[in-house]
Amino acid sequence: MDFPDEWTQKEFMQNKIKLEKEGVKVVLVDTILSPIEKAETTTYNPHEFKNYPDGTVLVFYCDSGKATLDRLKEYKERFPQHHCVSLKGGRGYWRKNMMLLDEDVL
């Protein structure tokens, strides 16, 4: 799979389901110490990421998505064994009650 620089919330949810069925770990990474309600997140911890399997997808988020997109090159250099993506719109655009319908799943 070719990974773009950004995923929307819907793309994140779709790709998480698809990739985890294929055995690929997908992690939503909190860079602002502010978890997203009703979402499984992990706090940014570079030492912990070293323990993740190679090929893990790290989806970084901040308040607006701008800071993580600006730092994406740095994340990709720091974690070359993983795929790094920024969450478009960040925490501010996350819809806590958004659900995927069967036809939405890739």
Q: Which ranges hold each PLM region?
A:
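Flexible, polar/low-complexity N-terminal or interdomain linker segments that lie immediately upstream
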Residues: 1-38, 106
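N-terminal beta-loop-helix "entrance" segment that forms/cooperates
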Residues: 37, 96-98
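Active-site neighborhoods of enzymes that stabilize oxyanions during catalysis
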Residues: 98-106
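Conserved beta-strand segments of alpha/beta enzyme cores
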Residues: 27, 40, 83-85
